[in-house]
Structure formats: C-alpha cells, structure tokens
C-alpha cells in the first residue's frame, strides 16, 4: 500500500481553467495580443490562440520576439461576427451557431484552420436542411396526380417540394473518392436526369398491370404507354402491398426517352450507375420530325427553366416516381419544381393554401434562404481551400463550384496534403510545394549557362536562353562590335537612330550619320558599306523586349508598352539646330 501510485484525471480542472482564462480576457488581464477585425479590437492571449488555431501557430511561431509590447494582428478576411463566435469558443469550448452566423463562422474557421469548427458548421447546415446521407435508406415518395385545375397543381407542387427536400441536389450524396491513395480526392454528384438516354433499356413483354397510359398533357403529339420494369426489389419495401395511387392513375417522376415506335429498343450496354436497383423502360410515339421534348410541366413557368430553349410546342409525360426510381432523376425534377415554386411566379400557385401547405411553403422558403446564404459566401469559402488539410476536406463536400446552386455535376471535394511550414499555402503535389518554398528561401537553382542569370523555374530559364540563341544581332556601324540588345547600339523600334554604339557616339561619329539623309553619301550604308551585317528587323521588337524587360521570373513585358513606345517614336522629332556637338548628339544619349 505504501508504493501505491495512481494517475488521476480531474475533468473539472479543464472547465475551471477555461473559465479563469476567459475572465482574464474579458478584463484585459495579461493579454499580449490584439486582433483587429473590421475595426473591432479583440484582446486575447497568444498561448490560447496558438493552441487553438494552426493559423495563429504558424503566424506567431515564425515571428521573432523583439519587445514585450502587445502584438497587433489584423484579419482582413474574416468578419467580426464570425471571429467573435470563434474566440468565445476558444475560451469556453462552446460554439454558438445560428442560421445567421453559420456561414461567417464557417468561413472564418476555414481561414484559421480550425477543422473542428468547420465540421460543426457542416453538421449544423446538414441538420438545418434536414438531409440524410445514409446510403442504405430507401426513400418512399407519396404519389400524386398532376391535374388540370390550379388547386391540384398547387397540391402537387407542394408535395414535390416536401418530398424533394430529403434528396435536394444542394446536399447530394457524395460518391466514393476517385483516387483515395492519390494527392486529391474528387467526388462528383450523380448526374441523373440531366440528359436523355442515361438509362438502359431491355426487351420486355407487354403487360396490362404495369402500364399507365393516361396522357397528362393534351397536345398534338401522341405518346405511347409508359412501362416500368423493376429488378432486385424486395416486396418488403412496399409492406406487402402496392403504394396507393392518387385518383385516376399513378404519376411517375421520370423523364421519358423518345422512341420511333411501340416496340422496345435496346440502346446499349448497362452503365455504371449509383442506383442499380431498377431498370426503367420508357417509350413514346412521336411525330415524324422527332422533336425534343420539354420536361417542364404545363403548370410551371418555362421562362426561368434551363430547358426553355427547346421547342415550346413539344410535350412530355411526367410521372411521379416510386421508390424504385433513380435518385438523380428525382433530384433534378424536385430541384426544378422547388425552383419554380420559389421563383416568384405566384400566378401558378392557384387559390390560397391550407395552413399545413402554408407551413410547408414557409419551410421551403427558409431552406431557399439558407441556400442563398451559402451561395453568397461560396466564393469566399472557395478561397480558403488552400489552407485546409485532410481534416478539413468535408468543408467543400457539398459546396458547388459553379455559380448555379442546382448544378448537379459541379460538386467537388478538395483535399490538399502538402502544407508550407512558413505560411498557410498547401498543395496537392510535393513538387508544387517545393517550388513554392523557393519564394521563402530565395533559392534560384536554374542558372543561364551563357550569362549566369538565375531563375526559380526551369521553363523560365529555357525561355531566357532564346535571347542568346536567336539569329537577330545588332552590329555597331562604326566599330563593328556585335551586341545582343538593340539598346546597346542605340536602336529602338520605329526611330531614325542608326546602329552606333554609345562609345562611338561619344567620339562624335554620329554627326555625319544624322545629316547624311537616306542612302546618300552621308548615310550609314555609304560610310560603312561592309563592316558587318546590320540585322535590325523593325517589324520584330520582341527580341529587344525580352532582353530589356525580362523580370526575375523570366516573364516578358506587356506588348502594350511596346506599342506606346512605337507611337512615341514614330512621331516627328524637331531637328536640333546646329551649334555644337553637344546639341547635335543630345538625342542620341
């Protein structure tokens, strides 16, 4: 008993320590850093910030301690509201999230590289949108009928919105990463229903039980019956009985594919689809012109739909899906129905809604508002992709890259593995990080073999060597020395200056060249007929520009500057009056 040893952990000490630190922060006791966000000052302790955020850890560990004064840090990316919630979390371990600040907090957390807060905001958004991402969940949708009257259209519209919230394309289920062992994992949303002909078709015998032949849109085009073939579907999914149909017939939510006749035509081999439980077979009888059909129902506006450019006279049978329909096709239709509902076209909603339907409409409007908030911050969140590592890749799992919130094939997961130890830069490949590190170390490993100039990238050095290997050279008309740069011999594109170097011009050799005119006995050709080739090409100023304007990275200057030079020097110059050699050669210097 005398040698007894026990390692005890008292969890209350954590809360007590955070409470004391928070009180010190609120009273400004021992605060050694001030964080300025949007003009608002937040006092804090460096140790707490450094221990909570990888951004502050990188920032404060690289800065040498020069004085005992408080450090002032300016954060221009994040907002004051978002940073206040984050700094309160650092000192209390409690994160206050609301529908108003979740986007700002998520953006600030991604910038500060706090993956725990990013994941919490991610879960909060999923819970707010009531999204389920269970892979084995079976979605049963109530069947409804699209009637001709406005009241039945309104009921169908509300039912579609409420049923589609669980499969909204905004938070579509992600697929497995395309390359889990590579440098990045990119998962795309299922592109169901976005184009025709995605489903495979196989021969099937006609049967009276699975045919819904009642046309839903009147028109000149005659459509054949719609047939649905189900494979690998257990009867237990339906509870031993079929789903109740609404009124006269079942309405299936599926886009039909055009066909030339009644017979079933196989279109090709089976494709790799996410939902392989069903194989749907749909045929139509269309006119000889085989016009493209429009997927827009008659009770919805066609002006704001993505398919509005198609033939407005073409009709299409749209039927409500059972649980065997593919998830992607239902997602697209519900997205379009929800967009039509929330797009401001009140004339299509018919008479006033019942209280239950009114609540559903308000709930759908709240979802749309949150979606708009996400889209407004999407560009800002995309800028933070570089500062995230493997732990923070879920931030961009459900955020589309495109500008449209309903682009089903634009969902991407961003994962970057290699991080810079000096700044927040991260890269997907080690070679990119190695090249980035040269900006911190000043290393230039690629020297020019001719002139010794060094470059950070090999391609810049190769482009620079073209200056030395080019055929265009400039020869002084007096001493016949060869120069690589036109400026060395006083040649500029579009000017009247002759090929005389600075040394020869200083000895007074340019006087007779200037007064000689063109081609006479005083011209350069007459004075120096064969001393060396004069290879100036006035139509190609690029060689001079590459030598004179190439910066540290080997980048050539803008062509606009050359054009301005040309305009300047093509303008007539007043001849200098005779009166001394200094005045005669002033324009040569």
Curated annotation (Swiss-Prot):
Residue positions, PTM Phosphoserine: 234
One of the record's GO cellular component terms: chromatin
Major location category of this protein: nucleus
SMART domains: BTB, ZnF_C2H2
Keyword vocabulary terms for this entry: Isopeptide bond, Metal-binding, Nucleus, Phosphoprotein, Repeat, Transcription, Transcription regulation, Ubl conjugation, Zinc, Zinc-finger
Biased composition (Polar residues): 305-325
Compositionally biased residues, Basic and acidic residues: 197-207
Zn-finger region bounds: C2H2-type: 418-436, 446-468
Pfam families xrefs: BTB (PF00651), zf-H2C2_2 (PF13465)
Sequence ranges of Acidic residues compositional bias: 546-570
Domain BTB: 31-99
InterPro entries with a match to the protein in the record: BTB/POZ_dom, SKP1/BTB/POZ_sf, Znf_C2H2_sf, Znf_C2H2_type, ZnFinger_BTB_dom_contain
Methyltransferase as UniProt keyword: no
Stretches for region Disordered: 173-330, 512-589
Record's keyword annotation contains Ubl conjugation: yes
Post-translational modifications: Sumoylated. Desumoylation by DESI1 reverses transcriptional repression activity.
Any GO molecular function: zinc ion binding
Compartments reported by the entry: Nucleus
GO terms of biological process kind: granulocyte differentiation; macrophage differentiation; negative regulation of dendritic cell differentiation; negative regulation of granulocyte differentiation; negative regulation of leukocyte activation; negative regulation of macrophage differentiation; negative regulation of monocyte differentiation; negative regulation of transcription by RNA polymerase II
Covalent S-S links between cysteines: none
Domain of life from the UniProt record: Eukaryota
Cross-linked sites for Glycyl lysine isopeptide (Lys-Gly) (interchain with G-Cter in SUMO2): 229
Function: Functions as a transcriptional repressor for PRDM1.
This protein's name: Zinc finger and BTB domain-containing protein 46
